[in-house]
């Protein structure tokens, strides 16, 4: 089941070079350490067992631990000219036979437990019963956020008080899904452990209202609905929800997900017949036919190595969101055995993943590494040109935008810069955390739900009708 980026075609032979040559431009020989780093789940973060067992209980009382943030001083601009630890493009070694398993997104045992019950709110707890106490209703809540036959909604925090709704579900910690959630929110929120940690850290929501769902385990909600969270292959902490209503209907809400093979290999699909699926249709268009993440990562590593031969003193800047894109920069750090420089707020977020090996790769000191992670908006030609001036020890900066939104042609198989100057190269990488059109089709044909409801880019009646015809065709073909 493990996703091993290093098994991609010819990648080992292209990167695993043992020779240590003198680099005249650097005046020193730099050889990457051939050490094996024992790390968890950056790319193989689901370890699925085919056998489903029934356990007796599930503990929901564990307190969430916020990350312990160290506070080293930021790098001094006066030391910006200090020579960085450049690698030689001819002496890059893979430090491990397998891709670094940074970022322990999930420990997915594949076990279904008996339906442990969540406690109901006490009648004398006015704050709990008061429900949403934050912002006022900011529009009508879309129908696809309500789970039929239950008192549950998914990713619906920006619509104010919703009558008859007892429980709120958060699929992952991206702002378009938690928008409207604040420290004043006082209704039960169900999510993964990582997402709960981020909600507590960043939004200061009272931990009493955060209920952690263990992956691949059934739990019973106060209204009698059973729910199971399963990995969504989207970003750390992202999950899909399967609801089993009191009338026996199985409803899947995907949230945002990437339906690569690792998702289809989850044996839950063999155990449960899905009646209704609320489907992430972000890229439900034949034009969006981008490669699998492991292929994109391999291509990016090839591009970087080739770039280093032209510009040995290369600075690499990768755009990222608050959470997401970890696989991309972790793969680069592993291939070239370097630190990962992140901003202080990003460090706090990554510490919520509770991954010691990842922390060992991280640094706040820009002078310590040539691999910097910055917000997407900072990766532009103008900003990177100015950024390079601050660090004159580098001769060129490669900006990487790992998102399908950033590229002009989503069907191209080879990576090509979309903007390049003497000082800056901008590379759009079709690294998506949403399903491609082909992956959506394969998922639908595999799960074969009775009804499909699109949740993205489906606000118009004509669009919904067109998607319905597409879904019907997929099921007929499959």
Question: Can you say where each PLM-predicted feature lies in the sequence?
Answer:
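Acidic/His-rich, metal-assisted hydrolase cores and their charged scaffolds
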Residues: 1-160, 164-170, 184-250, 254-478
């Amino acid at each position: 089941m493990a996703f091993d980026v290093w098994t991609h075609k010819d990648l080992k032979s292209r990167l695993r070079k043992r020779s240590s040559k003198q680099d005249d431009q650097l005046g020193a020989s730099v050889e990457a350490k051939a050490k094996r780093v024992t790390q968890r789940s950056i790319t193989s973060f689901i370890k699925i067992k085919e056998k489903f067992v029934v356990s007796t209980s599930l503990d929901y009382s564990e307190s969430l631990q916020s990350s312990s943030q160290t506070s080293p001083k930021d790098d001094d601009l006066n030391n910006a000219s200090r020579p960085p630890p450049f690698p030689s493009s001819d002496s890059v070694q893979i430090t491990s036979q397998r891709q670094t398993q940074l970022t322990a997104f999930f420990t997915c045992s594949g076990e279904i437990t008996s339906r442990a019950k969540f406690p109901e709110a006490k009648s004398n707890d006015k704050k709990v019963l008061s429900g949403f106490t934050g912002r006022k209703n900011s529009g009508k809540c879309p129908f696809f956020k309500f789970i039929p036959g239950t008192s549950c909604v998914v990713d619906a925090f920006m619509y104010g008080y919703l009558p008859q709704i007892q429980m709120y579900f958060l699929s992952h910690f991206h702002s378009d899904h938690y928008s409207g959630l604040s420290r004043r929110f006082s209704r039960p929120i169900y999510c993964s452990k990582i997402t709960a940690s981020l909600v507590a850290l960043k939004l200061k929501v009272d931990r009493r209202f955060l209920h952690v769902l263990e992956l691949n385990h059934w739990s019973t909600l106060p209204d009698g609905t059973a729910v199971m969270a399963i990995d969504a292959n989207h970003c750390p902490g992202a999950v899909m929800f399967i609801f089993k209503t009191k009338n026996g209907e199985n409803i899947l809400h995907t949230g945002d997900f990437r339906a690569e093979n690792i998702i289809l290999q989850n044996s839950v699909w063999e155990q449960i017949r899905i009646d209704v699926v609320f489907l992430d249709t972000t890229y439900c268009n034949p034009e969006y036919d981008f490669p699998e993440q492991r292929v994109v990562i391999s291509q990016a590593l090839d591009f970087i190595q080739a770039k280093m031969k032209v510009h040995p003193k290369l600075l690499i800047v990768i755009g990222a969101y608050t959470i997401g894109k970890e696989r991309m920069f972790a793969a680069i750090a592993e291939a070239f055995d370097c630190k990962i420089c992140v901003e202080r707020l990003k460090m706090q977020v990554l510490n919520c993943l509770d991954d010691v090996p990842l922390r060992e790769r991280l640094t706040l000191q820009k002078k310590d590494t040539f691999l910097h992670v910055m917000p997407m908006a900072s990766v532009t030609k103008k900003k990177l040109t100015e950024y390079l001036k601050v660090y004159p020890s580098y001769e060129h900066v490669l900006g990487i935008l790992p998102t399908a939104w950033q590229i002009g042609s989503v069907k191209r198989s080879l990576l090509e810069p979309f903007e390049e100057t003497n000082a800056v190269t901008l590379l759009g990488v079709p690294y998506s955390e949403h399903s491609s059109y082909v992956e959506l089709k394969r998922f639908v044909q595999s799960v074969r739900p009775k009804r499909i409801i699109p949740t993205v880019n489906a606000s118009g009646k004509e669009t919904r009708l067109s998607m319905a015809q597409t879904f019907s065709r997929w099921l007929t073909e499959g």
